Design a protein with these regions (language model features):
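Bacterial N-terminal signal peptides that target proteins for export
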Residues: 2-9
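N-terminal signal peptide c-region/cleavage motif recognized by signal peptidases
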Residues: 16-17
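Amphipathic alpha-helical coiled-coil/rod segments that serve as protein-protein coupling scaffolds
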Residues: 22, 49, 54-147
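Short, solvent-exposed beta-edge and connector elements
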Residues: 25-26, 30-52, 58-62, 147-152, ...
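Elongated periplasmic alpha-helical coiled-coil
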Residues: 32, 40, 131-163, 180-181
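Exposed loop and linker-edge segments at protein-protein interfaces
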Residues: 49-50, 55, 67, 157, ...
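Short, conserved beta-turn/loop elements at beta-strand boundaries and strand-helix junctions
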Residues: 158, 218-224
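Short, well-ordered beta-strand segments in soluble/periplasmic domains
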Residues: 172-220, 230-241, 251-252
Length: 255
């Protein structure tokens, strides 16, 4: 089945031309990984820390929502956990006293089992309170949107002071492209596609620079560009510390 090739993010298709030389193919550079991230919780945007074109590192805060309501929920959950912890300790002490009486023969088996049941309930209530606290803390953490990996900021739809609804049909996002790793896309005929198996070492040439690359995958179906060129899409990954813009032409020297 033939299909139109599109950029990694679904942008408009750009032509890639196969050349006659058997040892080199022309292609273009794409982002190795391009993702849209959002906060995961809803709230008013308190701060935006990045702008398009900026380089960010993994864990860097991109956007902050107003945390007040989430902080209140954490304090409530922490108080509830402390209360259930105290009740659990008291129930544990009661059970130990009842166990001592049972060992002396002063308490029936039925009464001891009732104490065991009360202790089990106290333990379960405390466990649930701990989970509620962890959940509240997790939601508080989500008010600070962080970069999942080293990246370039492509664009952001967050607006300072606006309400960001995470469950909206089109929620506010920051679009990131992985920094340091790139993909070269090219078309190959069937014979060459059979040669370029995953792991094959190649050389990628971009603007006079050479990079060691590796074939990441080869398409199983032919692809047709908007210019009518047909072939099998080959993806090659390579590393570069410098920015290489998506859509930049490249050449790939084959083994």
């Amino acid at each position: 089945m033939k299909k139109s090739i599109r950029t990694l993010a679904g942008a408009a298709a750009l032509a890639m031309t196969m050349v006659a030389a058997a040892d080199s193919l022309q292609g273009k550079i794409e982002w190795s990984r391009r993702v849209a991230v959002n906060t995961g919780v809803s709230g008013q945007v308190r701060a935006i820390h990045v702008t398009p074109g900026e380089a960010v590192v993994a864990g860097q805060v991109l956007v902050e929502l107003d945390p007040v309501l989430f902080q209140i929920r954490v304090r409530q959950a922490r108080s509830q956990e402390a209360l259930y912890a105290a009740e659990m300790d008291a129930q544990q002490a009661d059970f130990e006293r009842e166990q001592a009486l049972f060992d002396e023969g002063s308490l029936s088996t039925v009464q001891l089992k009732l104490e065991q049941l009360s202790l089990s309930r106290a333990l379960a209530a405390h466990t649930f309170a701990v989970l509620e606290l962890e959940h509240a803390q997790h939601r508080l953490d989500l008010t600070r949107l962080k970069a999942p990996f080293d990246a370039w900021v492509i664009e952001s739809s967050f607006e300072l002071g606006a309400y960001a609804a995470s469950d909206a049909e089109a929620p506010a996002t920051v679009i990131l492209a992985e920094r340091g790793v790139y993909a070269a896309h090219l078309l190959a005929d069937r014979a060459l596609a059979n040669r370029l198996v995953a792991g094959t070492a190649v050389t990628v040439r971009v603007s006079g620079q050479r990079f060691a690359g590796t074939v990441a995958g080869t398409g199983l179906e032919p692809t047709t560009t908007v210019d009518g060129v047909t072939g099998y899409l080959v993806t090659i990954r390579f590393e570069s510390r410098a920015l290489i813009r998506a859509g930049t032409p490249c050449a790939v020297d084959l083994p």
